[in-house]
Amino acid sequence: MADASAGGLYQCLTDISRADTSGDYQKALTSANKLIRKYPKETFAFKCKLVAQIQLSQYADALELIRKTPAHQMGHVGFEKAYIHYRQDELDEAIKELNTCDKDDVKALELKAQVFYKQENYQQAYDIYLYLLKNHSDDSDELRRANFLAVQARLEAQGVKQAVAETEDSYSQLYNRACVEIEAEKLPQALESLEKALKTCRKSFEDEDREEDEIEEELDSIRVQKAYVLQRMGQKAEALAIYEKVQAANHPDSSVKATITNNIPAASSDFALPESRKRFKAALQIDQTKLTRRQRLTLMLNNALVLLLSNQREPCKRALEELVAKFGSSKDVALIEATLHFKMGDAEAALKVLAGSDLEQSLARLHVLLNAGRLPEAVGAIRDLPISGKLGASSLLTSTLIAADSRDEAVKELVAASTAKNQTPEALKSILEDLVEVEQQRGNETAATKHLEKLVEKFPEDLQLQCRLVGAYSKTDPKKAESLSAKLFPETMEVDVNVDELEDSDWILYGEKYRQKKEAKSPQTAEIAATRKLKIATKRKRKIRLPKNYNSAVTPDPERWLPRQERSTYKRKRKNREREIGRGTQGSSSANPNVEYVTASPNSPRPLPGPVAEGPRQQRPNFQKQKKKKNASKF
């Protein structure tokens, strides 16, 4: 054995072992290079160098080392090559390399399960983890169990029901269990699991003497998931507070950043579109390899939606094209694209995009037809809806038929709806009232009266309906109208009402508020009223004052109340006699004997064109303005 101080084999191996224990892989790489130079035939040295390069993320150098090193010196490196491809997001190449490994190699099986999970082949990942949990047990059982729960959460999201065992101990397992419960719509249970995960995470990290920053970073991931659950449960204010707190902490995890950016606009009722555009633009520049396919798709969809709401039409169009290129078309993409076309005034293009047969696209297509005024096509679209038998669809169809001036068809639809089974009383009342209105619009008072009779029969306590029936009878059968009116409003009613008190009450004229104010101003109890002396209200009689020159023998002038200028005995001054010419009622002429009317001579000049008449107006005398007196100078 060579001397240790001279950098012999023993010293190099010791340095590699220490570096691996301390996590100093740069030192391990240096020791491996030294070992290869001194002992080029040592197979173990090449493997150590390869592992050190992988740990230092020197993937290109690691692949170059595998390519240059002969297979008999390097040994089998299928797992290492697969891991490099996995970290470089070359998942298909990773699967090829893993297929060359031993079928019972636990490391290769776990890596294959992770690759399947990233490829979203969740059922294959589920089978591998289930096999490992049943047939292998080592120090990685806790991590294996957490990964298994993560796969179960994804399967639950795809609609594959999962049974979760109550064996979670670590915070990772509790967190992933909560994810399964979220996908199963068990939100209260998920919230409880996340609360346990927060406590367990802090305790386990404190037991390991981790720094507070590291603990908070891990807790923030759980808090964001908790905020999502609160948001789904309708507690948006609490969820928004958590999102903003985590966002202020500047979390380094790309998945957490993307989740916060995506969820804040949905949780906030008054979010600003310009600010949201900036956040989505920043979120799309995050390392996309660390996000799941579902997260990337949701992020790009919401980005396109925010651009659409901001009226950024060209950027929205480009965002949709990029989305379709990466993930293909979908129902949500079609809805956003159709809305964009409709906003740009191209209803035909919007209808071409909405070619799907699902309910959402059918309703969107109907919305476009109605807004474009294509009522006959809209009627056909309503009838093709899978929910055409529902009350809302029937009401919309009737309104559309009436707007299209097809009242006969509208009546048929309403009659069919009124005879349908399992109708609630409120729905039946609404349908019959619509029938009455349509029949009255058609001028068919007899049919309207029949429908009103049905309404009164179904709802005999509704006085308003009975009054409407009286009005209908007055047009078709006056005798029935009189009979029903006498029944509803008899001449003598045995009601305990004090008519005199009602007539003397002011609150009937001025409303209930006047009554309440009057009672509040003078609260009197029965005891005080009984002991107090009642004052008899006496009218104050004012003494009659007569004019000084009053003569009782002379009859008073009947025009004494008229203004002086309007009395028959009034004589105008000469200069004011011509003022009243042309005055009086609109359209009438006044004949004043003092005015001479002279016809214009044929040779008289043509008058200049006057202003255009603006219609009749109330005329007023033009009084001369009084001249302002000059102010005397002050000393």
From Swiss-Prot:
Compositional bias per record (Basic and acidic residues), positions renumbered to this chain: 557-569
Main location: cytoplasm
Protein's UniProt name: Signal recognition particle subunit SRP72
Binding partners and assembly: Heterodimer with srpa-68. Srpa-68-srpa-72 heterodimer formation is stabilized by the presence of 7SL RNA. Component of a signal recognition particle (SRP) complex that consists of a 7SL RNA molecule of 300 nucleotides and six protein subunits: srpa-72, srpa-68, SRP54, F37F2.2/SRP19, F25G6.8/SRP14 and ZK512.4/SRP9. Within the SRP complex, interacts (via N-terminus) with srpa-68 (via C-terminus).
Gene Ontology MF terms: 7S RNA binding
Keyword Endoplasmic reticulum: yes
Subcellular location: Cytoplasm; Endoplasmic reticulum
Any one biological process term the GO annotation gives: SRP-dependent cotranslational protein targeting to membrane
Residue numbers spanned by region Disordered: 539-635
This protein's encoding gene: srpa-72
UniProt keyword terms in alphabetical order: Cytoplasm, Endoplasmic reticulum, Repeat, Ribonucleoprotein, Signal recognition particle, TPR repeat
InterPro entries for the chain: Signal_recog_part_SRP72_RNA-bd, SRP72, SRP72_TPR-like, TPR-like_helical_dom_sf, TPR_rpt
Cellular-component GO terms for this entry: endoplasmic reticulum; signal recognition particle, endoplasmic reticulum targeting
Function as written in the Swiss-Prot or TrEMBL entry: Component of the signal recognition particle (SRP) complex, a ribonucleoprotein complex that mediates the cotranslational targeting of secretory and membrane proteins to the endoplasmic reticulum (ER). The SRP complex interacts with the signal sequence in nascent secretory and membrane proteins and directs them to the membrane of the ER. The SRP complex targets the ribosome-nascent chain complex to the SRP receptor (SR), which is anchored in the ER, where SR compaction and GTPase rearrangement drive cotranslational protein translocation into the ER.
TPR repeat feature ranges: 7-42, 75-105, 106-139, 171-204, 220-253, 255-290, 436-469
Tagged with keyword Ribonucleoprotein: yes
Compositionally biased residues, Basic residues: 625-635
Gene3D superfamilies: Tetratricopeptide repeat domain
Annotated family: Belongs to the SRP72 family.
